[in-house]
Amino acid sequence: MPYCPVSPAYATVSKDYDKLRHVIDTLTPGLVFAADGARYGKAIAATVAADVEVILAQGALEGRKAGTFQSLRHTTATPAVDAAMHATGPGTIVKFLFTSGSTKMPKPVINTQRMWCANLQQITLSLPVLAEAPPVLVDWLPWNHTFGSNHNFGLTMMHGGTLYIDDGKPTAALIGETLRNLREIAPTVYFNVPTGFEMIAEAMKTDAQLRANLLSRVRLFFYSGAGLAQPVWDSLHATQEAAIGERIVMCTGLGMTESAPSAMFCNSPDVRSGHIGAPVPGMVLKLVEVDGKTEVRYRGPNVTPGYWRSDAATRDAFDDEGYLCTGDAVKWIDENNIHRGLAFDGRIAEDFKLSTGTFVSVGPMRAKIIVAGAPYIQDVV
């Protein structure tokens, strides 16, 4: 049975519920689960049809019957469960993950068993440290996003690891909870977004307990979602060298919801901010000149077959050779040594043209300004 984790912000921050209504109307679910009736009751009343079953972990809904998660746990398994499991195959849809929808309505990305299983193996082959011992994660990343869901949760499940859910996140109000958790639980691999690493790097300068616990057994730091400024990278390395006498490997790559998510990794020791590396095993890249830049396109077992009930969007997403058009621009790290891989060169769509006819490449310009203004400038918007 396919499922879809939905961003809580669609039901708690939004007042018109436009994106949540779009998700519900697109998927037409037969069952809706919510953690708390009080927190999500208004959103459910506004978007979920009366004939759709609702299950709550706690609380109740005003004027509407809802089942309880506890009651589901007491369901007696029948042979139909085994039959349904054996009927699944590589092409079976396991979940839908919606894109971020920062500029348009989010798109429902089909995630098949083939996509997820293939990508977990691709990631493991690219980062073999993950298979050396069951990983221990301390993780805040949401499961409605491919980084937290497919990548982090999937790797934990594949390798028999342990995932501690971090109720903090990299905001001024909640970073304290993350730091408290990292003082208590020592991860073996640590995943975060650049803002998270920036806050942790700053805290480690003065927090001896954080340094000691976080660096006690971690084998890999990994960031994704945006570029990590080189000054933050350098600060982390300086702290690690002073505390334990060596650097923790910092890794990143490139991917998207449509590639389950990982398409490329830089796992060389000679890596800097902006590097994205080489394709994961089984992934074929196509480099195409678009408006004076080089777009990277994907084809492989981890690439989505398309968007659910969105034929036009699916057609537009692939070129005539079946490659997924990413909109990401890349360039060679070293044109004389292609084995070093690629560097990120911004988004095709974010570039714009001045009235003089000159193209402005926003992504690389941001990185150059941060480097030029270090350590006084940490980010540019």
Q: What positions do the PLM features span?
A:
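Short beta-strand->loop structural element characteristic of the AMP-binding/adenylate-forming
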Residues: M1-A35, I55-A57, F69-S71, P108-I110, ...
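Conserved AMP-binding A3 loop
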Residues: P5, M85-H86, V94-Q121
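Conserved ATP-dependent adenylate/AMP-binding module captured primarily in the ANL superfamily
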Residues: Y10-A45, G63-Q70, H74-A77, N119-V138, ...
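Conserved pre-ATP/AMP-binding loop-to-beta segment of ANL
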Residues: V54-A57, L61-F98, K104-M105, V129-V136
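Conserved AMP-binding/adenylation subdomain of ANL enzymes
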Residues: C117-V136, W143-L210
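Gly/Ser/Thr-rich phosphate-binding loop
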Residues: H159-G161, L179, T188-N192, A201-H275, ...
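Conserved ATP-binding/catalytic segment of the ANL
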Residues: E289-L354
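C-terminal boundary motif of the adenylate-forming
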Residues: G327-A329, I333, V371-V381
